[in-house]
Design a protein with these regions (language model features):
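Conserved HGGG/HGGXW glycine-rich cap/lid loop of the alpha/beta-hydrolase fold
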Residues: 2-53, 59
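Conserved alpha/beta-hydrolase "nucleophile elbow" surrounding the catalytic nucleophile
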Residues: 16, 82, 86-88
Length: 144
C-alpha cells in the first residue's frame, strides 16, 4: 500500500481494476486528492503490482476475498471506515464491500464498473459488436 496526505483527513481508498497495479492511479492524481483534504490510500490487490502473484489460471482466491482485502487495508490503516473509489473490477469490489460491510464504507465512487444489481429493463441493450470485441480478450495471452 501507499498513502498520500494527512492521516487525520477523510480517508479514500483507490481500488484499481483487474491486472492493473495501484500505480495506475497517477501520483499527481493522488497528490491532488490529498491537497483537497483527503487521506489517499492506493494498494495492489492480489496478482497485481507488488502483491502476491500466482501462475496464470491458478489463482486460489475469489472475488469475495478480493473485496475482503479492501477491509483488511482499512483495518491495516486503523480506520473505522473510508470512502471507496473503484475503477472497473475495483468498482465491483467496492460495491461488494459496501454490501457486506456497510458501516465500513463512507461513500462509493464507481468508474467503468459492472453493476451488482439487476439491469434496468428500460435501458438499451449493448451493441453486439461491443460484446464480440470484449469476447476476443478470452483468446489473448495475458501471461506477459
Amino acid at each position: 500500500t501507499e498513502s498520500f496526505g494527512d492521516p487525520a483527513h477523510e480517508p479514500i481508498i483507490l481500488i484499481m481494476g483487474a491486472m492493473s497495479s495501484a500505480v495506475w492511479w497517477p501520483d499527481e492524481f493522488c497528490s491532488q486528492l490529498a491537497k483537497m483534504g483527503r487521506y489517499v490510500i492506493r494498494y495492489d490487490h492480489r496478482d497485481t503490482g507488488k502483491s502476491t502473484s500466482y501462475e496464470p489460471g491458478q489463482a486460489p482466491y475469489s472475488v469475495e476475498e478480493l473485496a475482503d482485502d479492501v477491509v483488511r487495508v482499512i483495518d491495516g490503516y486503523g480506520l473505522e471506515a473510508a470512502h471507496l473509489l473503484g475503477m472497473s473490477l475495483g468498482g465491483f469490489l467496492a460495491q461488494l464491500v459496501a454490501l457486506k460491510y456497510p458501516k465500513r464504507v463512507k461513500s462509493l465512487t464507481l468508474i467503468a464498473s459492472e453493476r451488482l444489481a439487476d439491469a434496468d429493463p428500460d435501458m438499451p441493450a449493448f451493441d453486439p459488436a461491443i460484446i464480440e470485441y470484449h469476447q476476443r480478450a478470452e483468446s489473448l495471452d495475458w501471461s506477459d
